């Protein structure tokens, strides 16, 4: 059967079945979670700033604080709605600013802290104490600290969330294999911000967000909706503009990976990416519409559970008109490939996967509807035996 005859009815039948369910699953976010409102947004922004100005800062809690800041921008009511719509049973803790007394170096001092169940007052005080040390050092070096270098600069929280936007696009792998790419991108896009803040260490901040998203999956729902809301709001600071660009790339990646993945899942014995290239335009349109219906956030969940599909979707397609496009072109597994792989690790992993499929006799070349030229290109890549191939 030629690939052009393959239809996606199985996908839509499944979707129809799922959409007729009369019941919903309720998940729990835990005993009690912090959901801050707008009124503590400034304080959470300052907490982010304190971490950013601290040299060699401990970023263990940066991801959590960043998510609390994101929720404070959404507001308590909208955050609760997002979680409940996602099927979570929420026991919400209100967050206020209180005065906390703590002994520091033998002297009792007053601090303003937030009433958080996820972050003790002692941890908050320690963040402030360490930041004060770095701030004093900055005063000695600069004489006067310019507003954009201070811990209360209004864009501190958004700087931290830019790292989160980079991380969320890499959750598909199911591990932290995308960390190197996150660091490289952050060093490039946030170059000015890294120069401003000595405590902005992309690797440590990224690991903190990985930890948060892995440990508390409900934060993924919150962050996706926050990202959409933030990116759709006109105006804002330079960093807000950077965030919007990073997030929309991640959001789009979720839809792209879902699109290729749905199509690949519906076609048996065919290299995942190749199916999308060889399918009729009508089918591709169907998948676009299906992805749009589910939304980008659904894409994140799909790729999280289908890393093979995401593996074959992550690189760009440098030459969409090449013969077989090396299974979604950017990877160059089979067929003509023009250009250098953008990600050598992905290329090698995908090629190894292709070779493994061939060794197991899984690839059915006759289904691929190949021309003589395409078949020759495959021979150059995987050296199949003549009796393995049917035209």
Curated annotation (Swiss-Prot):
<protein>
    <recommendedName>
        <fullName>Nucleoprotein</fullName>
    </recommendedName>
</protein>
<keyword id="KW-1090">Inhibition of host innate immune response by virus</keyword>
<keyword id="KW-0543">Viral nucleoprotein</keyword>
<dbReference type="GO" id="GO:0052170">
    <property type="term" value="P:symbiont-mediated suppression of host innate immune response"/>
</dbReference>
<dbReference type="GO" id="GO:0039580">
    <property type="term" value="P:symbiont-mediated suppression of host PKR/eIFalpha signaling"/>
</dbReference>
<dbReference type="GO" id="GO:0030291">
    <property type="term" value="F:protein serine/threonine kinase inhibitor activity"/>
</dbReference>
<keyword id="KW-0945">Host-virus interaction</keyword>
<dbReference type="GO" id="GO:1990904">
    <property type="term" value="C:ribonucleoprotein complex"/>
</dbReference>
<keyword id="KW-0899">Viral immunoevasion</keyword>
<keyword id="KW-1102">Inhibition of host PKR by virus</keyword>
<comment type="function">
    <text>Encapsidates the viral RNA genome by forming a left-handed helical nucleocapsid that protects the RNA from nucleases. RNA replication depends on the availability of soluble nucleoprotein. The encapsidated genomic RNA is termed the NC and serves as template for transcription and replication.</text>
</comment>
<dbReference type="GO" id="GO:0019029">
    <property type="term" value="C:helical viral capsid"/>
</dbReference>
<keyword id="KW-0922">Interferon antiviral system evasion</keyword>
<keyword id="KW-1139">Helical capsid protein</keyword>
<keyword id="KW-1114">Inhibition of host interferon signaling pathway by virus</keyword>
<dbReference type="GO" id="GO:0019013">
    <property type="term" value="C:viral nucleocapsid"/>
</dbReference>
<keyword id="KW-0694">RNA-binding</keyword>
<feature type="region of interest" description="Interaction with the phosphoprotein">
    <location>
        <begin position="244"/>
        <end position="290"/>
    </location>
</feature>
<dbReference type="Pfam" id="PF03246">
    <property type="entry name" value="Pneumo_ncap"/>
</dbReference>
<feature type="region of interest" description="Interaction with the phosphoprotein">
    <location>
        <begin position="338"/>
        <end position="364"/>
    </location>
</feature>
<dbReference type="GO" id="GO:0039502">
    <property type="term" value="P:symbiont-mediated suppression of host type I interferon-mediated signaling pathway"/>
</dbReference>
<comment type="subunit">
    <text>Homomultimerizes to form the nucleocapsid. Interacts with the phosphoprotein P. When in a monomeric RNA-free form, interacts with the phosphoprotein (via N-terminus). Interacts with protein M2-1; this interaction allows the association of nucleocapsid with the matrix protein.</text>
</comment>
<comment type="similarity">
    <text>Belongs to the paramyxoviruses nucleocapsid family.</text>
</comment>
<dbReference type="GO" id="GO:0030430">
    <property type="term" value="C:host cell cytoplasm"/>
</dbReference>
<dbReference type="InterPro" id="IPR004930">
    <property type="entry name" value="Pneumo_ncap"/>
</dbReference>
<keyword id="KW-0167">Capsid protein</keyword>
<keyword id="KW-1035">Host cytoplasm</keyword>
<keyword id="KW-0946">Virion</keyword>
<dbReference type="GO" id="GO:0003723">
    <property type="term" value="F:RNA binding"/>
</dbReference>
<keyword id="KW-0687">Ribonucleoprotein</keyword>
